[in-house]
């Protein structure tokens, strides 16, 4: 039997000074892009020296292949410098540095990968709640992935690592290709066990090839494997031994078990108590026997390690022990007792990065609990499906309360599902109500993926059916564990020619499509999500446009005159170029208005020039690098001059605007918003999409645009892929319009470009649709488009602290906003711009409270009495009969809050705010009951994007127009500059959406 202190020499000739390696424990502490942090270097340096080798945790080989946040990357050459520092820190004390390389495959959560749908051998989701169904990799993608692994090995060598460990375990991509559960292919990469070994073998071959190219005969190559899978069908131990024999034949330095205990027995047949290492030694081939094998799991003290070697392992891998005992190897070899727990005050001393420290409890796996979990899954998969026949109604939790679901059962089958969605929001939820029931019926399983963009509604349907199953005497837990069928995958390619293709089904895309249809063009609109709507359907519906004749019928509010007087006093040096001429025109207009006020004419003023100047000043910002930005004049001039054109066009298309009130959205600076009578943005989506259908326009959902087709600098078409893998190749006679939105749901992309905010938290919430991940910007940039303003991102100050959503709680007009901090004090002009408000929120702790009374509650247009009552019960809104009681409930000083409200009410009476200069006042806070809505900034709008001209033509990096390519909406930059006014987003999408449709139709 080998001893812990014995050296070991690998086939490559590399020698380790003992039989201990530090296991590749994920510490989740890399930069947002996967770069090495100093915390990581310190962590590994503190643990090196004693062990023969340190295996550094999973490094993703492709940008969208992360399995967890804070993952380490080796996907680009830019990572080499940081990895070099890491390797040097490990090797400086005598340990060999080995880097584990992997791709998560279907385990790549879109949340950690910019919203990108995961990939795998086949479109089969993992057996876990809400698992995303992956895209099946094409043959070309498989070859590219093998090259990516080779590139990763090359970078590891350049960074100075002594070897790599190929991560073929933990249900990640390499294991997925070997697994009969996740690999249902019938080509050279799958179909039988022999072909399922092809991908792991190809990765090994590529690894060896790269090492040979560097003349690195002494480069360590290891392979980590999970011996079994619980899934049906899944990897069994005999299968694993077949794979290991193939790998060993090609030459390896070691195999590395991946399991929670070195003494673990089978998870497939737990009644068989024989340890897997014993089975391994009995079944090993001659080739496998020559490769050292590492045992892992449950090795806390020297005795554990020695027992593992005695059981048959050649080496031991220590994970959790090294977390709390950085010198574990030295202590174990000196027969000292190793710590098994860390004191709460030891984080700094142990050099444990904060992300790891915060999740260490969750990283310590309870082996007994894991065994029970596996046994439970196995039992549930064998439970017979039986019901008490009949019709049962149960409920799930939807957006607006309980969602009734009526399910009809036979004795062994779900026969029918009827969802009563009458109280749910239109548009965005519809696919969930149609698709989820059908998928349940087709598969007779509750193991169903939620619909992208309709997560809450999807879960409500699933929960409703689950509850109905239990009412009918069935076992909903068993149905949730029942394997889902593989997606019927298509290798079909559809090729056709149309006049125009529009990418994105939000307001900009629908406007462009309808405009082109009006001009007699054939148009196809592609939407990657199951439902159209994008961010537009999530808005409050406010559309800015200066309409002085209409606005002049409304009285001026207290504070508005003061706002205009301050604006008129702005130094002319603040204005650049043609904006100065507009400012001079505006000052003359204001002189006339002030005269009218003196003569008793108390009306609301507005003009196109005021809208333009406020858009300019509202967007004029300087970033952290001292770079200033403001809206490109001709783009802003076009937007503000043609805004009423857009309002009239929308009215013509059936939008019924409420002319009884003129409103000011959050951060709008002025009352000029037009709003439909039907609440929220769904009115625009509903009416415009119906017009498109009436004119035989084609809207294709579940279809993701991937690449523009460019010929001699001109865009001549676009490629896309549908949810079932069908490829679309669409040639265009006129052009392609990109209207796919910004990247507000892609935190990594925001952090990559950010130059404005001091910090963007990894867990910051967003008001955006999860579809908005910047793919349209990436597609355009690949075709040569110039990007502008990418460093600026707008935060919505009044986001929901839990979800990031905008339209929860009491969202009232800003003239009725009253913000207080945790000291119960006001701290800002509540009518200020969004970035100013967000910064003020951060300066006051991030979370603040919006205070309202019963009268102000009645002005909330985002909600209903029923929703308010529900949100009070849930704690989204806090209600009290007195201000004193409200202060107690939200934890602010009672006297401060009552004084603050008294002072605010005095400002309303006086029509001016000496301390914060609030620009408009509405109602006082005086009628019980009183309300507080907690709010916190969330990502709302990304300011940068593709550069366009006033014809919505995309501009290339050479400054020239890219023929055949147009863009509109948040996918573009240059209009709003550093900050967008509330209400300007919708007028932007409808104005430039129409312009894009016009230009593409007319071949401008």
UniProtKB/Swiss-Prot annotation:
Its cofactor is FAD; FMN. The modification FMN phosphoryl threonine is found at residue 455. GO terms for cellular component: membrane. InterPro entries: Aldolase_TIM (IPR013785), FAD-dep_OxRdtase_2_FAD-bd (IPR003953), FAD-oxidoreductase_2 (IPR050315), FAD/NAD-bd_sf (IPR036188), Flavocytochrome_c (IPR010960), FMN-bd (IPR007329), OxRdtase_FMN_N (IPR001155), Succ_DH/fumarate_Rdtase_cat_sf (IPR027477). SUPFAM superfamilies: FAD/NAD(P)-binding domain, FMN-linked oxidoreductases, Succinate dehydrogenase/fumarate reductase flavoprotein, catalytic domain. The keyword Protein transport does not apply. The active site is at 834 (proton donor). FAD binds at residues 508, 527, 535-536, 540-541, 775, 941, 970, 985-986. It is an enzyme of class 1 (oxidoreductase). Binds 1 FAD per subunit. GO terms for molecular function: FMN binding; oxidoreductase activity. Optimum pH is 6.5-7.0. Is flavinylated on Thr-455 by ApbE, encoded in a neighboring gene. Flavinylation is essential for catalytic activity. Induction: Is maximally expressed under anaerobic conditions in the presence of acrylate. Under aerobic conditions, is highly induced by acrylate. Its EC number is 1.3.1.125. It catalyses: acrylate + NADH + H(+) = propanoate + NAD(+). Keywords: FAD, Flavoprotein, FMN, Oxidoreductase, Phosphoprotein. Catalyzes the NADH-dependent reduction of acrylate to propanoate. The principal role of ARD in Vibrio seems to be the energy-saving detoxification of acrylate coming from the environment. May also use acrylate as the terminal electron acceptor for NADH regeneration at oxygen deficiency. NADPH cannot replace NADH as the electron donor. Is also able to reduce methacrylate in vitro, but with a much lower efficiency. Belongs to the FAD-dependent oxidoreductase 2 family. FRD/SDH subfamily. Consists of three domains. The first domain of ARD (Oxidored_FMN, PF00724) carries a non-covalently bound FMN and is used for NADH oxidation. The second, FMN_bind domain (PF04205) contains a covalently bound FMN, that acts as an electron carrier between the two other domains of ARD. The C-terminal FAD_binding_2 domain contains a non-covalently bound FAD and forms a site for acrylate reduction. This is NADH:acrylate oxidoreductase. It comes from Vibrio harveyi (Beneckea harveyi). The gene is ard.
